[in-house]
């Protein structure tokens, strides 16, 4: 069980957060939702998830990889503690990875929208994460990476009115 709060930062309309990040003062933690920890291989839930491969988001809603009723058990931050596959990463002063370990964990996750995270960028909790992110961007640019900013599009369908 991890002591520090982790943050699932996503669109305000997201209902199934599947990743979160934290910094404990030494390590960057990246958490991925871990339904495989409780879904039995070849069970109906497993077979259905493998057949779908991913959650499909369409204007009318979402065709979920895992059933809607399972969502609270597998998404991050919908319960007090969430099961996760967690990557503990030690970074050097430039943000390059020095060491990485993987653990099955229980994590406390606070959900934030992108807008909320931006407002809290200078807060004690999020400032280290933003610093790590900016170092990573700079390191990638120095290595020749090209950054393309694309607008995010969200389409919703309203019921037809007569």
Over which residues does each language-model region extend?
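Electropositive polyanion-binding surfaces
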Residues: 1-162
């Amino acid at each position: 069980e991890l002591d520090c709060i982790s943050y699932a930062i996503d669109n305000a309309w997201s209902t199934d957060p599947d990743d979160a990040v934290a910094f404990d003062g030494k390590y960057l933690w990246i958490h991925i939702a871990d339904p495989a920890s409780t879904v039995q291989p070849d069970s109906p839930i497993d077979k259905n998830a493998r057949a779908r491969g991913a959650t499909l988001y369409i204007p009318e809603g979402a065709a979920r990889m895992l059933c809607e009723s399972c969502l609270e058990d597998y998404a991050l931050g919908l319960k007090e503690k969430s099961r996760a596959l967690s990557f503990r990463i030690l970074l050097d002063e430039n943000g390059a990875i020095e060491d990485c370990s993987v653990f099955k964990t229980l994590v406390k996750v606070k959900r934030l929208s992108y807008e909320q995270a931006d407002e809290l960028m200078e807060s004690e909790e999020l400032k280290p994460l933003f610093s790590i992110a900016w170092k990573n961007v700079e390191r990638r640019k120095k290595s020749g990476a090209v950054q393309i900013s694309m607008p995010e599009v969200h389409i919703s369908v309203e019921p037809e009115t007569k």
